[in-house]
Amino acid sequence: METTAAATAAERRRPLFTTEELGGRAVYRVQAATVAAGILLVLYYRATRVPAAGEGRAAWLGMAAAELWFAVYWVIAQSVRWRPFRRRTFRDRLAERYEQNLPGVDIFVCTADPQSEPPSLVISTILSVMAYNYPSEKISVYLSDDGGSILTFYALWEASIFAKKWLPFCKRYNIEPRSPAAYFSESKVHHNLCIPKEWALIKNLYEEMRERIDTATMSGKIPEEMKLKHKGFDEWNSDFTLKNHQPIVQILIDGKNRNAIDDDRNVLPTMVYVAREKRPQYHHNFKAGALNALIRVSSVISDSPVILNVDCDMYSNNSDSIRDALCFFLDEEMGQKIGFVQYPQIFNNMTQNDIYGNSFNVSYHVEMCGLDSVGGCLYIGTGCFHRREILCGRIFSKDYKENWNRGIKERGKENINEIEEKATSLVTCTYEHRTQWGNDIGVKYGFPAEDIITGLAIHCRGWESAFINPKRAAFLGLAPSTLAQNILQHKRWSEGNLTIFLSKYCSFLFGHGKIKLQLQMGYCICGLWAANSLPTLYYVVIPSLGLVKGTPLFPQIMSPWATPFIYVFCVKTLYGLYEALLSGDTLKGWWNGQRMWMVKSITSYLYGFIDTIRKCVGMSKMSFEVTAKVSGHDEAKRYEQEILEFGSSSPEYVIIATVALLNFVCLVGGLSQIMAGVWNMPWNVFLPQAILCGMIVIINMPIYEAMFLRKDNGRIPTAVTLASIGFVMLAFLVPIV
């Protein structure tokens, strides 16, 4: 008996997860130290070689300010690179200890617009998270529909019927992925793993369902006979509008009802539709408000101790993701500290060379791992498992013991209608009035980047977080497939993050004394995206104008002072390339990423910066734009061919075209004047500026093609080209003094 007890105790001491420091840190630290020395020399040179008035002093000081900012941001970025580590889980140990006592999991899926986020896409995500390799009776799925659309409700009702066949099929053949849309799109890979007749039957059922849903979406209405299938359809009457309607909570599958079973007679997960009450006179707080509504609704239906939230386009790609996350929460030694577990946001529609720089590979393989080593990764708004208690404001305490069995007990005497009525009362417009919801309880309000500020608040309450990036991606979604979508998304992100930085929730202020300095700095990497806009815009415009106007802004190439400039640029660039290749990018993908960083800095981040400043002085109100998840056929084809998509006369395209054209004209004009000896100065005085201008021209080659060579509908419109020519002519009137 003693031997058995000792063996059991030893088994429980075996960790459910381990950490492993990433390699190559010695090389990194040498690189960082030498680059830091080079940066100091560059700044010293700028400070001690200021030209006389009228000889480019203002431009020189502007260059010094831009380089000082780049130096500060570089230091901030190094905070997460000093000691990053990777995590590994042990699901077999989890099963040995907890298989009979696994906690319940509530899964939140949010959608806002059936046009930008088609219902057929939403239900594929819903079906994928219902089919986890996890006891179905312990899974509850909640869909928040901020569009309040009968089309989305209809699609969810269709999914509740199809789930009876889909879930047994998934578990019988242990298929991956468990999104029907993704699975059948990879049919050539999976077809031979199943009985052909059964595979064909399920595929036909899915395609018929999707066609019914898509037909209804295109027509904007559902067949009248369908409205008789479920009482929930009665909620939509003639007075119902998107921004003015009553609250709706409908339980489509009651997982605690013994009759809610699939075709193999196994219990189905609970499925709930939620549409918050909307009234014109009440602010609904966007996605943060939707998540808080789901927290309350789920508390009276399933009340599971673990909550997963995913965006409606981020389907489950790994059926063991719940078990991996639980390895962190349930670890006997370290799990008590962990408040949330974050998976990366990975996209399945990436082109081979990531034309729009959507991959975030370096962020996930380096930066998030580095944040993990200093107290916790960021909460990025999707693919995240939380303890319910931390979303309800709990402060970390060593004495706190989680009740992992909450929500599993059988329901009392309340019937489903009473439960729905009770839940509906929790999502009215007035429920949160004079409460701490959105402040100390739930997801934070008042910021477009509600995920970042909520994660920071959790860390400041003493909790840590864990980042896990398994070989098989846990979630896959849709990246923006046009330049306009990409610019919009990054504008929203950068604006939200800068708003946080400029508020009382700045990580240096709010986190002082609560989280490590490195973590405070780590939050600023994304918090200061928008602040890179003006220095970047300055650096891609002023040196080029100086080249054509005969104003040198760098040491001549033969001077010893040119060495730190060259060293910092080359080593930073090469190490960035090394990180990108190590993280899975291609060489061309890295190059595309450099272009997109410049494009985002002078458009997305610039707009985000301006809008944030406007908001700070009371000139505009916070808004939220939904990034479209679908593109037209021609746009999709050009995306697959890795051709940049323009096609409209948006102001941001004018900025991009102007910067590209300005550098081309300055390069040609500047070199012509140097060769002609116009400036009466040695040619090597202007060589650094010519090299910088030339690199900007090379990186903008796709822009020139879109302006002058392409004939497709995705080219830069003639109006944009003409406007950019006009702005270039105006730029030459700017004196470089």
Curated annotation (Swiss-Prot):
Gene3D superfamilies in the record: Spore Coat Polysaccharide Biosynthesis Protein SpsA, Chain A
Active site: D146, D451
Membrane-spanning residues: 26-45, 58-78, 528-548, 551-571, 654-674, 683-703, 716-736
Topology class, membrane: Multi-pass membrane protein
EC annotation from Swiss-Prot or TrEMBL: 2.4.1.-
Highest taxon, organism lineage: Eukaryota
Top-level enzyme category: transferase
GO terms, biological process: cell wall organization; cellulose biosynthetic process; plant-type primary cell wall biogenesis
A GO MF term: cellulose synthase activity
Annotated GO CC locations: Golgi membrane; plasma membrane
The entry's keywords: Cell wall biogenesis/degradation, Glycosyltransferase, Golgi apparatus, Membrane, Transferase, Transmembrane, Transmembrane helix
Subcellular location: Golgi apparatus membrane
Major subcellular site: Golgi
Protein role: Thought to be a Golgi-localized beta-glycan synthase that polymerize the backbones of noncellulosic polysaccharides (hemicelluloses) of plant cell wall.
UniProt family annotation: Belongs to the glycosyltransferase 2 family. Plant cellulose synthase-like E subfamily.
Database matches in PANTHER family: X-BOX TRANSCRIPTION FACTOR-RELATED
Name of the protein: Cellulose synthase-like protein E1
Organism of derivation: Oryza sativa subsp. japonica
Gene designation: CSLE1
